[in-house]
Every structure is written in C-alpha cells, then in structure tokens.
C-alpha cells in the first residue's frame, strides 16, 4: 500500500475494486468465430466480466456463445443481451448468463425500432424482463432510455438492478469524443454503436450485418443498414458534477 493508494481510497471510497485493489473491468465481445480467442486474451489480461453484446440477444448465436464461454471459463462472470422479454431473460440465464441487459431501441441515438421493427419502450421492457429475473434471482441492467435522473428512478422501480448510461455522460470532460464549437457553444461528438460511422469502423458484428470484413469505406457504407445516428451533446464539464446531479435526483425520487 502506497500513499497514492490511500489518497485514491479517500477520494473515491465507492470505487469498484477487485481483491487486488484494481478497478474492476468488463469487456464486450461478439459471437464470431474468434470468440474463444478474444475471451482467452481478456481473461489473461485480468478481465472481471465479459459482455456478449448484440442488438438481439434472444438468438441462437448468443445462446451458443454463452454456453461456449461457460464451458471453457466456468467462473467468469457473463453479461448477455439485449432482450426485452421475460422469455429472453429465461433463455440467456438458462444458457449460463449471470446478468442480462434489457433494452432494444431505447437509446437516444438508436433507431433500431424504426429500421428493424423490433423493440419495446424501455419501462415496459424492464417490467416484463423483471418478472423472469426475480424468479431466477438474477440482476438485469436497463440499457438505454436514460435522459434524466428520474429515468433511473423509474428503471429501478420497474425492476432493474442498475442502468447503463450514454448520453447523460457523453458530454463530460472524461468521456471520449471531440469537443466542437457550434453557434457559440461547446459540444462533444456522440454516435450510436449502430450508426453508419461506427458500423463502418468496427461494430457491424453487433448488429448481425456480416460486413465487418469488408475493406473499403465505400463498400462498407453501401452494404450496411444503420440502426443509429451520429450527433452532438452539450459539453457538461466534469463527470463528478454530472454524477452529483444524478445522485440528487435519485435521493429525491
């Protein structure tokens, strides 16, 4: 233990750490042929959990991926999704998932519902998924649909154990993205994983487009059906200030 460790513990008493004092880290993987290779590399690097991250989690490819990981790494924490039904939660849990992500098309920059015709309003999805999660005694994560602190309150009240937040944190200094000046105000760029830019680069596998191996930018953009958009959010300063506002809203709720 060093002085730096003591200062970190004092400044961040609620930091999520493992038994060696390191910040816990999870990593997302797809369901491609290189799944085992990627998970093996992550486990060697000390990952705490892997997330099988797809737009439609209640599918044979995801179920088989969970079974493969659980067979090879029985003690590794597995998060899987996304689903919006009780049946989806049951299927993923029975395959070996420890936690299930809930939400299809709920994100502020996600257009899956209008592009694919699939999805459910987020509060309804959490309420539906929680029926199975409570019976199976597994946590669910509300992924998307959080624009204000009140949305976190509603998600937890509906049955979510926790939530994933994108747009509320996207404008913080600590988040990735370029700072832009637009009409005299500071913004940060923000794009969905299903946007054309992200899918052309690396995330096409998540949406089952099968175009992740296409080489040229023009070929990629011509063969992909985007399920998200790119935009900008106001720069909000330090993430500590943003979280303080969230906590205030949660306490009031």
Question: What are these regions, as identified by a protein language model?
Answer:
Residues 16-26, 42-49, 73, 106-114:
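Gly-rich Lys/Arg/Thr-decorated short loops/hinges at beta-loop-alpha junctions or inter-strand turns
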Residues 18-28, 68-84, 99, 132-144:
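Short beta-strand/loop segments at the ligand-binding rim of alpha/beta enzyme cores
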Residues 49-54, 141:
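Short acidic catalytic loops
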Residues 2-16, 34-38, 54-78, 83-94, ...:
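Active-site-adjacent beta->alpha loops and helix N-cap segments on the catalytic face
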Residues 54, 104, 167:
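Short secondary-structure boundary segments
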Residues 28, 95-98, 117-142, 146-253:
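Alpha/beta catalytic cores of nucleotide-metabolism and tRNA/nucleoside-modifying enzymes
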Residues 44-50, 72-76, 94-99, 105, ...:
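Glycine-enriched alpha-helix->loop->beta-strand junction motifs that scaffold or abut catalytic
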